[in-house]
UniProtKB/Swiss-Prot annotation:
Pathway: Cofactor biosynthesis; coenzyme A biosynthesis; CoA from (R)-pantothenate: step 4/5. GO terms for molecular function: ATP binding; pantetheine-phosphate adenylyltransferase activity. Homohexamer. It is found in: Cytoplasm. InterPro entries: Cyt_trans-like, PPAT, Rossmann-like_a/b/a_fold. GO terms for biological process: coenzyme A biosynthetic process. It comes from Wolinella succinogenes (strain ATCC 29543 / DSM 1740 / CCUG 13145 / JCM 31913 / LMG 7466 / NCTC 11488 / FDC 602W) (Vibrio succinogenes). ATP binds at residues 10-11, 18, 89-91, 99, 124-130. Belongs to the bacterial CoaD family. The record marks 18 as: Transition state stabilizer. Its cofactor is Mg(2+). The keyword NADP does not apply. This is Phosphopantetheine adenylyltransferase. Its EC number is 2.7.7.3.
Length: 161
Protein backbone atom coordinates (compact mmCIF):
# COMPACT_ATOMS: atom_id res chain seq x y z
CA UNK A 1 0.00 0.00 0.00
CA UNK A 2 1.37 3.42 -1.02
CA UNK A 3 1.89 5.68 2.01
CA UNK A 4 1.92 9.44 1.58
CA UNK A 5 2.97 11.62 4.49
CA UNK A 6 3.07 15.37 4.92
CA UNK A 7 5.77 17.30 6.76
CA UNK A 8 4.27 20.77 7.26
CA UNK A 9 5.98 23.93 8.41
CA UNK A 10 6.80 27.51 7.59
CA UNK A 11 10.47 26.66 6.93
CA UNK A 12 11.49 30.30 7.43
CA UNK A 13 14.23 29.39 6.58
CA UNK A 14 14.90 25.68 6.06
CA UNK A 15 17.37 24.35 8.65
CA UNK A 16 19.65 21.33 8.98
CA UNK A 17 17.14 20.09 11.57
CA UNK A 18 14.34 20.22 9.00
CA UNK A 19 16.51 18.39 6.47
CA UNK A 20 17.32 15.72 9.04
CA UNK A 21 13.59 15.05 9.49
CA UNK A 22 12.95 15.20 5.71
CA UNK A 23 15.70 12.67 4.93
CA UNK A 24 14.55 10.24 7.59
CA UNK A 25 10.83 10.55 6.83
CA UNK A 26 11.48 10.12 3.10
CA UNK A 27 13.04 6.73 3.86
CA UNK A 28 9.93 5.65 5.78
CA UNK A 29 7.18 6.77 3.39
CA UNK A 30 6.67 6.25 -0.33
CA UNK A 31 5.93 9.94 -0.86
CA UNK A 32 6.74 12.81 1.48
CA UNK A 33 5.06 16.12 0.75
CA UNK A 34 6.95 18.96 2.39
CA UNK A 35 4.12 21.44 2.83
CA UNK A 36 5.16 25.07 3.14
CA UNK A 37 2.57 27.03 5.09
CA UNK A 38 1.53 30.48 4.02
CA UNK A 39 1.20 31.52 7.61
CA UNK A 40 -1.64 33.83 8.56
CA UNK A 41 -0.30 34.23 12.11
CA UNK A 42 3.43 34.70 11.48
CA UNK A 43 5.18 37.41 9.49
CA UNK A 44 7.89 35.47 7.65
CA UNK A 45 11.38 36.78 6.95
CA UNK A 46 11.31 35.05 3.56
CA UNK A 47 8.33 35.20 1.18
CA UNK A 48 6.51 31.95 0.44
CA UNK A 49 8.05 31.66 -3.04
CA UNK A 50 11.58 31.89 -1.60
CA UNK A 51 10.87 29.34 1.13
CA UNK A 52 9.53 26.95 -1.52
CA UNK A 53 12.58 27.52 -3.72
CA UNK A 54 15.01 26.87 -0.85
CA UNK A 55 13.21 23.60 -0.13
CA UNK A 56 13.22 22.55 -3.79
CA UNK A 57 16.94 23.22 -4.03
CA UNK A 58 17.70 21.31 -0.83
CA UNK A 59 15.53 18.30 -1.70
CA UNK A 60 16.29 18.00 -5.42
CA UNK A 61 18.15 14.72 -4.82
CA UNK A 62 15.32 13.22 -2.76
CA UNK A 63 13.11 11.55 -5.41
CA UNK A 64 10.24 10.72 -3.05
CA UNK A 65 9.94 14.33 -1.79
CA UNK A 66 7.53 16.88 -3.25
CA UNK A 67 7.41 20.51 -2.17
CA UNK A 68 4.02 22.23 -2.15
CA UNK A 69 2.57 25.26 -0.42
CA UNK A 70 -0.78 25.50 1.30
CA UNK A 71 -3.00 28.12 2.92
CA UNK A 72 -5.87 25.92 4.05
CA UNK A 73 -6.45 23.77 7.10
CA UNK A 74 -3.71 21.15 7.23
CA UNK A 75 -6.28 18.38 7.76
CA UNK A 76 -8.05 19.43 4.54
CA UNK A 77 -4.76 19.70 2.63
CA UNK A 78 -3.81 16.18 3.76
CA UNK A 79 -7.17 14.78 2.66
CA UNK A 80 -6.90 16.48 -0.75
CA UNK A 81 -3.45 14.92 -1.24
CA UNK A 82 -4.48 11.45 -0.07
CA UNK A 83 -2.10 11.63 2.89
CA UNK A 84 -2.97 9.86 6.10
CA UNK A 85 0.14 10.74 8.10
CA UNK A 86 1.61 13.99 9.36
CA UNK A 87 5.28 14.10 10.31
CA UNK A 88 6.38 16.52 13.00
CA UNK A 89 9.74 17.11 14.62
CA UNK A 90 10.21 17.32 18.38
CA UNK A 91 13.35 19.03 19.67
CA UNK A 92 12.42 19.43 23.31
CA UNK A 93 9.68 18.83 25.85
CA UNK A 94 8.48 22.37 25.17
CA UNK A 95 7.65 21.34 21.58
CA UNK A 96 5.61 18.37 22.77
CA UNK A 97 2.73 20.27 24.39
CA UNK A 98 2.09 22.38 21.28
CA UNK A 99 2.48 19.42 18.92
CA UNK A 100 0.15 17.26 21.00
CA UNK A 101 -2.58 19.92 20.84
CA UNK A 102 -2.11 20.31 17.08
CA UNK A 103 -2.17 16.54 16.59
CA UNK A 104 -5.45 16.27 18.46
CA UNK A 105 -6.93 19.22 16.56
CA UNK A 106 -5.97 17.70 13.19
CA UNK A 107 -7.37 14.31 14.23
CA UNK A 108 -10.65 15.95 15.24
CA UNK A 109 -10.90 17.52 11.77
CA UNK A 110 -9.81 14.37 9.93
CA UNK A 111 -10.09 11.17 12.02
CA UNK A 112 -8.09 9.18 9.44
CA UNK A 113 -5.07 11.45 9.99
CA UNK A 114 -2.26 10.16 12.21
CA UNK A 115 0.64 12.26 13.46
CA UNK A 116 4.06 10.76 14.02
CA UNK A 117 6.87 12.54 15.79
CA UNK A 118 10.55 12.29 14.92
CA UNK A 119 13.34 13.68 17.03
CA UNK A 120 16.16 15.38 15.15
CA UNK A 121 19.64 13.97 15.55
CA UNK A 122 21.53 15.34 18.53
CA UNK A 123 23.66 17.77 16.49
CA UNK A 124 20.48 19.38 15.11
CA UNK A 125 18.37 19.42 18.28
CA UNK A 126 19.09 23.06 19.14
CA UNK A 127 18.51 24.50 15.66
CA UNK A 128 15.35 26.47 14.97
CA UNK A 129 14.33 28.84 12.21
CA UNK A 130 13.78 31.60 14.78
CA UNK A 131 17.39 31.25 15.99
CA UNK A 132 18.60 31.46 12.40
CA UNK A 133 16.45 34.54 11.70
CA UNK A 134 17.93 36.23 14.77
CA UNK A 135 21.46 35.40 13.63
CA UNK A 136 20.66 36.76 10.16
CA UNK A 137 19.28 39.99 11.60
CA UNK A 138 22.58 40.48 13.42
CA UNK A 139 24.59 39.55 10.32
CA UNK A 140 25.99 36.38 11.88
CA UNK A 141 27.20 33.18 10.26
CA UNK A 142 24.59 30.47 9.54
CA UNK A 143 26.52 28.11 7.26
CA UNK A 144 26.71 25.43 9.98
CA UNK A 145 22.95 25.60 10.63
CA UNK A 146 21.41 25.38 7.15
CA UNK A 147 22.04 23.21 4.07
CA UNK A 148 24.78 24.64 1.82
CA UNK A 149 22.31 25.42 -1.00
CA UNK A 150 20.14 27.38 1.44
CA UNK A 151 23.15 29.34 2.70
CA UNK A 152 24.12 30.19 -0.89
CA UNK A 153 20.54 31.15 -1.72
CA UNK A 154 20.30 33.46 1.28
CA UNK A 155 23.69 35.03 0.54
CA UNK A 156 22.68 35.75 -3.05
CA UNK A 157 19.18 37.02 -2.23
CA UNK A 158 19.76 38.87 1.00
CA UNK A 159 23.43 39.88 1.11
CA UNK A 160 23.10 39.88 4.87
CA UNK A 161 25.94 37.61 5.93
Amino acid sequence: MHKTAIYPGTFDPLTNGHMDIIRRASMIFDTLIVAVAKSATKEPMFPLSEREEMLRLATRECPSVRVESFDTLLADFAQERGACILVRGLRAVSDFEYELQMGYANASLNPALETIYLMPSLQNAFISSSVIRSILLHKGKISHLVPPVVCEYIQKRRSCM
